[in-house]
């Protein structure tokens, strides 16, 4: 059911995405008995829709990992479990890999804003930055503003529109605004919409 929802949503994302536009998905594998490789399923869905795969980034969250003791059989080969301290950022394109812009757009409104050192750092496939507190944000699964900020700086120009079909607490919209991009966000949960609007307004003041 969850995968069917993702397929429906990302089919619409593909429809409205500009040629060469990028789709970036933050996702984690789940479970232990059995372990469910959600990233593999999502990759298949996206390729079936027609997206081109650009690569995947590992978000290393180990610096802010909790004190979980869910290691299965402790200090024994009986049934040890891996404790995931990373998530995936899957990157796709529509139609082609290059995001085109005219000479006029390059001069006037659609500009790059990423700094040289950040560009070099962001091309590496492992990103390290801390997680966001669910209690602090008021959302069960928030990601830090740093995550969409990096993707927006790396994959878009100023004035571009950033779409988040699962806007949640509004982190993507906040990052887009900070980076000089426009944004559109959706969510089926009215409480999350109110939360996102509140956070966006706070950032604007």
Which residue stretches match the model-derived regions?
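Core catalytic lobe of class I
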Residues: 1-195
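Short, conserved SAM-binding/catalytic segment
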Residues: 197-205
């Amino acid at each position: 059911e969850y995968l069917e929802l993702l397929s429906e949503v990302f089919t619409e994302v593909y429809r409205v995405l500009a040629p060469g536009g990028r789709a970036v998905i933050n996702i984690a594998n789940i479970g232990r008995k059995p372990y469910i490789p959600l990233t593999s399923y999502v990759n298949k869905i996206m390729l079936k829709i027609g997206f081109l795969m650009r690569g995947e980034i590992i978000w290393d969250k180990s610096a802010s990992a909790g004190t979980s003791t869910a290691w299965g059989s402790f200090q024994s080969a009986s049934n040890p479990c891996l404790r995931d301290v990373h998530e995936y950022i899957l990157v796709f394109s529509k139609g082609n890999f290059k995001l085109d812009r005219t000479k006029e757009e390059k001069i006037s409104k659609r500009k790059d804003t990423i700094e040289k050192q950040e560009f070099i750092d962001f091309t590496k496939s492992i990103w390290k930055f801390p997680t966001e507190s669910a209690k602090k944000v008021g959302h069960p699964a928030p990601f830090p503003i740093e995550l969409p900020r990096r993707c927006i700086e790396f994959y878009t120009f100023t004035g571009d529109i950033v779409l988040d079909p699962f806007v949640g607490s509004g982190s993507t919209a906040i990052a887009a605004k900070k980076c000089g991009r426009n944004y559109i966000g959706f969510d089926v949960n009215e409480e999350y919409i109110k939360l996102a609007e509140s956070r966006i307004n706070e950032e604007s003041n």
